[in-house]
Amino acid sequence: MTTIFYAEPELVIAYGRKVLFLNPNDLQIFKDIELPADLTSCGLKITAPEISEEQQSTSEGKGTDGGKVEVAILNVCYSPDRQLIALTTAGQKALLLYKSRPEHAKLLSVRALARASSAMTFAADSSSVLVTDKTGDCYQYDCVEVNALPRLLLGHLSIVYDILWTPDQKHIITSDRDDKIRVTNYPATFDIHSYCLGHKEFVSGLALLTEEHLLSVSGDKTLRLWNYLSGMELLHHDLPAPAVRLHMRELLPAKRYQAAVQFYDHIEAIGLYELEQTNNIWTVACEQLVRAEAGSWNISNFALTSDMIYVAGAVNEHLALRVYNASDGEQAKTVPAGWLDMVTGSFSDQTCVPEDLSVWFKKRYDNVSDYMERKKRRIEGQQQK
């Protein structure tokens, strides 16, 4: 899985066992993190009783068949105060916490995860981090007492694709494969505050606009805006294709925002939507589609800045990075090709296999049609006798 996001002034790219922190303005590499092939060499231990024997075998660097387990980064997240970096891994499933300052990242802790992570976010005060896994559970990990055991906060019945923690830390917002958006009270996470219901497919991305407004995108080809405290839908906008990624920029506080959406299997790879609030009514003021040479390469993820769109993908099973103007969607000519080659060259020793997003869609089975067809053949057979 390729991770890329922009946290001003840094562009963060992660794939395989490596994370790069870049400054796209002066074309410099701030720092990098490279994980060892075996995380036990940097302190991975099994401490949680609920972790299975399979996880223990992988934590020792071997799979259940005795082969070597490939460590791969799944999620990367900066803390709000920019002092901490959290990342999760597959293979040897772990949560690693780094101190990001000074220049070189310093490893603070390595904690085993019971299952592969699906999403992650920090508390507003950077005191803890929430990690959701592929079975729908959400755990809280302390960033101060790094040896403290994780706390199970909530659970879904399907994989959680995105998670937000409101700035006042009173609500945790999660979205899942079963088209639900849940708003859970915190710290009393046994109490569900509200649901935002209306999507018909997986909800792939969430973004907070104001202290009560939430943006969501889904595989049902819609972008929706909610008052998440009441669960009321305030805006419904049709998209040209299923949405699999969402990034958001604030243009004018509480008034105007830009949402960038990555589409699944569409000739236009990315859509830019400007959302505007006037007299408490939200509208899509303008929209723009960016092709990003879709179809000529496998696009995995993207990052949005004030003037550029950085798109990561795969070409011939190697990581590729291309840059487009946010204003017109054309390929940026101000970014030197040599710099892009330098960045992707840092990952040249790793095979880049695109994530299969088709598994995000729910499979529907029509048993009635099969039954009716068998019944029809049986009746026809009886009539021929």
From Swiss-Prot:
SMART domains found in the cross-reference section: WD40 (SM00320)
Metabolic or biological pathway, per its Swiss-Prot or TrEMBL entry: tRNA modification; N(7)-methylguanine-tRNA biosynthesis
Localization per Swiss-Prot or TrEMBL: Nucleus; Cytoplasm
SUPFAM superfamilies the record matches: TolB, C-terminal domain (SSF50960)
Any single Gene Ontology cellular-component annotation: nucleus
Pfam families, sorted: WD40
Database matches in Gene3D superfamilies: YVTN repeat-like/Quinoprotein amine dehydrogenase (2.130.10.10)
Tissue: In testis, it is present at high level in hub cells, a niche for germline stem cells of testis. Ubiquitously expressed in all testicular cells throughout spermatogenesis. Ubiquitously expressed in all germline and somatic cells of the ovary.
InterPro entries (UniProt xref): Trm82, WD40/YVTN_repeat-like_dom_sf, WD40_rpt
Swiss-Prot/TrEMBL keywords: Cytoplasm, Developmental protein, Differentiation, Nucleus, Oogenesis, Repeat, Spermatogenesis, tRNA processing, WD repeat
WD-type repeats, residues: 68-108, 155-194, 198-236
Any one GO biological process: oogenesis
Subunit comment: Forms a heterodimer with the catalytic subunit Mettl1. Interacts with mei-P26 and weakly interacts with bgcn; required for the function or formation of the mei-P26-bgcn-bam-sxl complex. Interacts with nanos; may be involved in mei-P26-dependent derepression of the BMP signaling pathway. Interacts with Myc; the interaction may be mediated by mei-P26 and may be involved in the regulation of ribosome biogenesis.
Note: Wuho means 'no progeny' in Chinese.
Membership in a protein family: Belongs to the WD repeat TRM82 family.
Role summary: Required for the Mettl1-dependent formation of N(7)-methylguanine at position 46 (m7G46) in tRNA. In the Mettl1-wuho methyltransferase complex, it is required to stabilize and induce conformational changes of the catalytic subunit. Required for binding of nanos mRNA and repression of translation by the mei-P26-bgcn-bam-sxl complex. May cooperate with mei-P26 and nanos to derepress the BMP signaling pathway. May cooperate with mei-P26 to suppress expression of a subset of microRNAs. May cooperate with mei-P26 to regulate bam expression levels in germline cells during gametogenesis.
Protein name, as recorded: tRNA (guanine-N(7)-)-methyltransferase non-catalytic subunit wuho
Lineage of origin: Eukaryota, Metazoa, Ecdysozoa, Arthropoda, Hexapoda
Primary gene name: wuho
